[in-house]
Amino acid sequence: MQRVESVAKRHLNPACRQLLAAWALLWLLLPGALAQSASDPIIQLSAAQPGSLPPAMAGQSVQAISIDVTRLRRLAAGDVLPVQLAGAGSELLTVQSLAAFINGGKALNARLRRGNDSYSLLLSFDLDTVYGHVIHGDEKLQIQATREGDYYHGWLFQPRGLALSNNAFSNDYLIPQPQRLQPPANTAPRLPLRLSPDAPLDPVGVAASTAGISSSNFRLSQTITPSPVVAGESFTAEVRLENTSSSAHQSLAVEFYFLLENTTLEQASPGCRAQLSLSLQEVLYCELGDFAPGETKVISYTVGTTSDSQPRVISTAIMGELRVDESVNVVEDVRLDSDGDGVSDFNEDLLGTDASDSGSVDTRASVIDVMAFYTPGAQASFPRGVETRINQLIGVANQIYADSGVAIKLRPVYYGMVDADPDADMDTLLDDLIYKGDSAFDDVDRLRDSYGGDLVMLFDSLPDNADRCGMAPVGGYQSNGYFGAETEKDFAYSYIAIDCPVDLVVAHELGHNMGLTHSHLEDGSGGTFNFATGHGVDSEFVTVMAYPGAFNTDTRLPVFSSPLLDCLGFSCGVAENRRDAADAVQTLNLVRHQIAAYAPSRVPELPDASVSAVSGNRVDARIGVAASTDGGLSYSNSIGPGQLVDLLADVEVDAAHVGRQGSVHVMVGIVDSGFLQLDAAGSLVEWDGTREGLIPATSVAVLRRQERLTVLSDFQLPDQIPEEFIGQQVAVYVAYQVAESGDVVYTQQPLLLNIVAGSD
């Protein structure tokens, strides 16, 4: 403190000196201010038994643990986190990142890599509870603890498996079906009207008849190629008609309803023509002639599409009482990349960048806003921390995205309880959530609009002897990554068991929402693309979307399928040109922008600040800095007496700098009165204004694409602020430095916080 005060005396007027001295005291209390001892673990095995029983999801290797509340909450990015999870020694993990949630919860990610040995730890915690996900080599553990005094006491355990019988797996996804349309009934004999006024009427002959035709004596199928079809292109249908009876049928005809709505007939087999039904509906009418017993005939037609044909063309074939519905999705090409910048033309149009200029590109992660509803059953499963448990499951999903190379960040924007039917099963609850079949969900649509929810999750307790942990519709099914149909958002819901022993359940169920199925072995095909599915190797492993039992393994790796990733020495996926292709990573990166655009963002992100590099080089980086007085629901530039203030910084590193050694810097001061800087110990020290004089606020480490810092947490100004402080402005700059080049990327303009007399 003496060093800070001496700096203030040399550079600032008396009023400013007093204010900065107060700020210096505050910085000393920030996370990371106290040095951590490697010999004194923050998380350690405990001989004392917690006051609670091991959780129901616990399986093997259940051990009591304790976690130091104060030291955990003071950790900052770059700090060393000592943990004792086995034996007598400690492992020294490095905190990679911290995050704050709008419900006040926090999350921490820490890692250790030592040769072939590695630890990964993800914690979500609030004042009362902490939940953890631990990976050590092939071992996966979970942490669940509640606060008792100065420590969280609880359990470290391997989760149990789901109840499975006879190797049968209950499917946990559904495929939304097009609405079944009903052709208008004909009330009079057909007149042979042609659509073209210049074409002659049908010649007088024997009228076609379909009397007595049904599924008992005829079989009809349509095979459409290509499927899906890109708007503006054509598709062809081959129609096979088989008389399965031992009787002959004379003068038959088939009609195709809805086919010619918003399409153009380009070609059809002889005997087929476009005409109007008596209800003045355009139909394709095909005379088939006579059918001998067992005879099969094949006809075809080709139609052209436009954007008006979207989202799908329906072809309903009717012969007497026989009806066969077929459809083809009409989509946009979401993969064409004209400028080769790695972002498709379709997605560049969504993002507002120039698809013909490789220098105009937005490679930031897609922020998908999620809403978390939970039932009383879920609350009962985690009575002291249901929302923190939700944060943990979301955090695990975000970590899986990052580790897989998927540029998605789930951001919870709403938590709330719904009084759903406690006796309803998961299929019924999901159905009620989607179609609002239970009054408990009457307000969901309004809340979704108010909070800008892209995806909606319902958390419930896991039923006894359950063999699945969730249920969700598959988005964009067989649409080659196009989610433009208005109904896609209407089905963007999921049911999730909050006490599922498999804590990657959110990643799995939302994977369905984003177009993924399980695997070719289980489902026979992919989801939105043929390669939009999970992957496994028999007796070795599966990725997030596949079921371990289908591949005779207990090893489920926390990554999405990709032929570019390594899984225990095997490829994590299969290239898309193979019939059994599996590349969920490519799928998610192609569709993420559409999912994030389901709803406009309502809960604010950190505001962007213009950035510059000391070198003068152009940089593709973003630094957001903001202060919040309401837990992150909004941001303010004014702080007053008694208000709790959080100061957050979100740094997106230039792609050219990712993977290099670097550090993050925070400079703070009174406008026109000089600057101090925050060091890695959380103390304020003098800054002479030079690049050489910068001191890191985080440990020098490999720069990641995104660095999120809680610069200030729950700071409260005094209820009485001296009059000379009112109207003063505190300026905050954030920067990162690349160690190799020494280049500094910084906010051009600071965040200015006005000290006001009263709260705004």
Regions found by a protein language model. Give the residues of each.
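Low-complexity, intrinsically disordered segments enriched in Ser/Thr together with acidic residues
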Residues: 288-311, 713-720
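N-terminal prosegments of processed precursors
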Residues: 35-217
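Extracellular/luminal low-complexity Ser/Thr/Pro-rich, glycosylation-prone repeat/linker regions
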Residues: 200-219, 311-337
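A surface/secretory-pathway sequence property marking extracellular, secreted
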Residues: 250-285, 289-290, 673-695
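Serine/threonine-enriched low-complexity regions used as flexible
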Residues: 237-239, 302-328, 726-736
